[in-house]
């Protein structure tokens, strides 16, 4: 199974929408357009992809008196229901955090589902200072100050 096909299968499971005939091609084109700033990890059990997560690189606009910075946005984290609670999500998250640290990102940001907030908080993510109480934006690293 190619990585693109595996991502397509997982995306279909995640959204609970059957794949349409052109979906894999649209996904391949999207992945190609994003490849300079997005990395996607796949978790496999044997030959079956059971999880995925993406890390997108955001490049901050330069500003006088401040060095340029980059930060990561974690997205598309998904583990098949039958493969949950086996450490797969934790392994994907550890890989994302390690990559963000290696790339020297100023911060790692995500917007999790309500059900996943505790999972990310256990990994060191927190609501940024000044965020509204209902927001689910979580940050690991420096704050989101302008």
Regions found by a protein language model. Name each.
Residues 1-9:
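A short beta-loop-alpha structural element at the N-terminal edge
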Residues 18-44, 54, 60-61:
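Active-site rim helix/loop that mediates acceptor-substrate recognition in acyltransferases
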Residues 42, 48-57, 73-78:
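Conserved beta-strand in the GNAT
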Residues 65-81:
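Conserved acetyl-CoA binding element of GNAT-fold acetyltransferases
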Residues 83, 87-95:
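Conserved acetyl-CoA pyrophosphate-binding loop and the N-cap/start of the following alpha-helix
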Residues 93, 100-112:
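Conserved GNAT acetyl-CoA-binding A-motif
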Residues 108-118, 133-135:
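Conserved beta-strand-loop-alpha-helix junction that forms the acyl-donor binding cleft
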Residues 121-132:
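Conserved acetyl-CoA-binding loop of GNAT-fold acetyltransferases
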């Amino acid at each position: 199974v190619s990585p693109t096909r595996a991502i397509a299968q997982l995306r279909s499971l995640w959204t609970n929408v059957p794949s349409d005939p052109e979906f894999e091609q649209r996904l391949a084109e999207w992945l190609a357009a994003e490849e300079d700033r997005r990395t996607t990890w796949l978790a496999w059990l044997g030959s079956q992809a059971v999880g995925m997560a993406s890390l997108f690189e955001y490049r901050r606009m330069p500003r006088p008196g401040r060095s340029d910075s980059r930060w990561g946005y974690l997205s598309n984290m998904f583990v098949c229901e039958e493969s949950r609670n086996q450490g797969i999500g934790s392994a994907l998250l550890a890989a994302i955090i390690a990559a963000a640290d290696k790339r020297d990102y100023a911060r790692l940001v995500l917007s999790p589902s309500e059900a996943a907030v505790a999972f990310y908080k256990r990994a060191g993510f927190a609501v940024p200072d000044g965020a509204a109480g209902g927001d689910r934006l979580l940050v690991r690293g420096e704050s989101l100050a302008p």
